[in-house]
Amino acid sequence: MTNLRKTHPLIKIVNHSFIDLPAPSNISAWWNFGSLLGACLIIQILTGLFLAMHYTADTLTAFSSVAHICRDVNYGWLIRNLHANGASMFFMCLFLHVGRGIYYGSYLYKETWNIGVILLLTVMATAFVGYVLPWGQMSFWGATVITNLLSAIPYIGTTLVEWIWGGFSVDKATLTRFFAFHFILPFIITALVLVHLLFLHETGSNNPSGINPDSDKIPFHPYYTIKDALGFMLMLLILLTLALFSPDMLGDPDNFSPAKPTEHSSHIKPEWYFLFAYAILRSIPNKLGGVLALLASILILLIIPLLHTSKQRSLMFRPISQTLFWILTANLITLTWIGGQPVEQPYIIIGQVASISYFLLIIVLMPLAGLFENYMLEPKW
């Protein structure tokens, strides 16, 4: 009798994806982040579901309902802390996953890469609408400021903003629809993840060398199931440490005050994972220009496959491009820091230099480095 694992219509899909999947024998720990993101998504959906059972999407009771979850619901404080800090873990894994893709040339699997960029945008949208739900000061003013950016769109901008708000300001209608979006988007993300995996399994995984690994493949189970399990445990350790010892470390103190539309927050500051994009937005004094730069900072990922000039796929054997990659990493860390600072000198000029450097590195310097490395590899005699 043939193994059920290989014949059952449903089980064989799981088998081809997680058990008998041929995987390169040399993929490093940088390839763990895909499965870690899957784990993060499951954690977020489960904790979110339990929070939604007790949360009320109403301007009068939203803040109190979150306090009620933390005080009166069994382990409500833990569920909320896991959900809030789980978002930070999600983005940490996302950034490392994207960074891995850029470093090792995984973006040359164009369909997988493009779906990945769409996933990144969807997760960012989910996190933004989710941040509004506790209805604290930063929730309210964050929602007001970020949705207001759409008013920079010529002609239809103001109409669009009021349509999203459901009125003439961020109010009950806005909160209700943001809760609806926050509930539905993770399921859309799950569907996109399946498409992402579908395209990935058409080509198979890339590997650190960037060379075709077909001649040396090993089964996913037990090798990478064990390796992923170690990654899960380490991630869970970090998440639990964060949620249990310093749950509010990454949050904003302003969000402990209920939203007051009459009192303006002294500084509008998104969560840490949006600060790099926020810094790019603020570095341009023109509203429409800032919005376009904000969009470009993420959408630039879509053109990275077109900017690949090297004859080699990975950066593993390309020291000049490696140097530029780590400069880009330092640049993004600088932007993240600047995004959290007030709009005054010297932060303004640092932000502007870092923003220009970000686009310059990706669009000009890295493609040029690829061409130069090609030239250096050619025999000169």
UniProtKB/Swiss-Prot annotation:
GO terms for molecular function: metal ion binding; ubiquinol-cytochrome-c reductase activity. Coiled coil: none annotated. Binds 2 heme b groups non-covalently. The chain crosses the membrane at residues 33-53, 77-98, 113-133, 178-198, 226-246, 288-308, 320-340, 347-367. Heme b b566 binds at H97, H196. Its cofactor is heme b. CDD domains: cytochrome_b_C, Cytochrome_b_N. One of its GO terms (biological process) is mitochondrial electron transport, ubiquinol to cytochrome c. It is a multi-pass membrane protein. Keywords: Electron transport, Heme, Iron, Membrane, Metal-binding, Mitochondrion, Mitochondrion inner membrane, Respiratory chain, Transmembrane, Transmembrane helix, Transport, Ubiquinone. It is found in: Mitochondrion inner membrane. Pfam families: Cytochrom_B_C, Cytochrome_B. Heme b b562 binds at H83, H182. It comes from the Eukaryota. The cytochrome bc1 complex contains 11 subunits: 3 respiratory subunits (MT-CYB, CYC1 and UQCRFS1), 2 core proteins (UQCRC1 and UQCRC2) and 6 low-molecular weight proteins (UQCRH/QCR6, UQCRB/QCR7, UQCRQ/QCR8, UQCR10/QCR9, UQCR11/QCR10 and a cleavage product of UQCRFS1). This cytochrome bc1 complex then forms a dimer. Belongs to the cytochrome b family. Component of the ubiquinol-cytochrome c reductase complex (complex III or cytochrome b-c1 complex) that is part of the mitochondrial respiratory chain. The b-c1 complex mediates electron transfer from ubiquinol to cytochrome c. Contributes to the generation of a proton gradient across the mitochondrial membrane that is then used for ATP synthesis. Heme 1 (or BL or b562) is low-potential and absorbs at about 562 nm, and heme 2 (or BH or b566) is high-potential and absorbs at about 566 nm. This is Cytochrome b. It comes from Osphranter rufus (Red kangaroo).
